[in-house]
Amino acid sequence: MKESVGGIIKLRFALDNAAVRLRRGCLELAVVLSVVLSVRAQEPLPTIRSEANVVLVPTLVRTRAGEIAYSLQSKDFVIEDDGVEQDVTLDESPEQEPVSLVVAIQVGHKASSQFKKRADLSLYDSFYSEEERRDCRKRRVPCPTAIAGLGTMLRDFRDQTNGEVALVTFDSSVYQFQGFTEDASKISERLTKLTPGDDGAAILDAVNYSARLLESRPRNRRRVLLLISESRDHGSVTTTALSLTQQLAASNMLVCSLTFSPLRGRFAEDLKALPSGENFDLLVPLRASIGTLRKNVAQDIAAVMGGEDGKFKDKTTFDATFASITNGIRGRYLLSFQPKQPKPGPHPIRVRLRDSRKDLVLRARSEYWATEHQP
C-alpha cells in the first residue's frame, strides 16, 4: 500500500514538473514570437502589384545637361491614357523591389569579329581607336573587345539593385547563354566564353525570347531587358515587329538598347578586299543609310517601352553609355496607374509634369496593351 501511495506521489510530482516546464516553454515561445513580429512589423513590406489591372510607367527625368532629376512627387506627374488623366501612384521604396535583368548580346553578323582571337582583326574593326590598333600591332595581340568591362559593370549593377542577371546571345538563332543568377562571378566568367556567331542578327527573335524569360520571373520584381546589338534586324523568323510590339506593350518591362553601326567596319573590309584599280560602289553607303533609317529596330523597341538607347563605337564609349543607361534604370520614378477605361487593345500613354518645365526632359513608355482579363 505504501509503495502504491509513493508511486502516485512521484507521478504527480513528475506531472507537476512537466506542467511547469511546458508553461515556461510556452512563455518563452510567446516572448520570441512577439519580438519577431515586432521586428517584422517595423520592416517595410515589398510592393506586390498585380499586372492584371496596374500599368507600370517607370519614368526617367533628366535635366538638359543629362543629370537625373530627383525629389519629384506623385502630384508633380500627369499620366494620360488615350487623353484621359489617370490617378498616379508613385512607389516610394523602389529599393524593396529587386531587379531581374536580361542582357541580350549580338555575337553574329558584324559583331562576330569582336570574339575572334586574332590580332590582325583589330586593324579593320570599327570598335577600335587608331591608338588601340597601334598598340595591338606592337604587342601582336588581339585588342580588347568593346564590351570587355561588361562583367565588372554588371556586378556593380547587381549589387546596387539586389538583382539577378541572365545572358542571352544571338546570331541567326537565339541561345540562353546563362540562366538567372545572383552570382556576379558566374556572369563575368561566362562573358569570357563568348564566341563568334554566324552571319545573322535576329534582333526581334532575341527580344522575343528575352521578354519571355523575364515574364517567368516573380511579379514583385522589376524586369529589364538590355539589348547590345546593331540597329537593323537580320534574319528573325519567330516574330514580327508588330506582334513583338504588342507583346511588349502588354507587359510591364523596361527595354533599353546599346547599339553600334556596322557600316564603318564593313566599308574598311570591302576596301581591303578590292583588287587594285577596281572602282568602289559609292551607292553602297547610300543604300545602307536609307535602310537604317527605315529599320532602326533596336532604338524603336526601346522608345516604345520608354527605355534609353545609346550608341557606342569603342570600349570607352561603351563603358560611358552603359553607365549612363544603368544609372537611368536605377534613377527612374516608379509610376503606375489603374486604367479607368481598360478597353482591350492598344492605349497611347502620355506622361508629363503638371507644371511644365523646359529644363527637364521626361522619358517613359508611350503605350500599353490592355488584355481581355482586365476588369
List where the protein language model places each region.
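N-terminal secretory signal peptides that target proteins for export/translocation
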Residues: 1-23
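Intrinsically disordered, low-complexity regions of eukaryotic proteins
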Residues: 5-7, 18, 30, 53, ...
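Intrinsically disordered, low-complexity segments enriched in glycine/proline and serine/threonine
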Residues: 5-8, 13, 31, 133-137, ...
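Positively charged, low-complexity intrinsically disordered regions
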Residues: 13, 22-25, 41-43, 134
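General helical structural elements
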Residues: 16, 25-28, 66, 354
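Short alpha-helical segments used as structural interaction elements across diverse proteins
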Residues: 20-21, 37, 219
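Bacterial N-terminal signal peptides
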Residues: 25-38
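Scaffold/interface architecture of coatomer-like assemblies
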Residues: 41-375
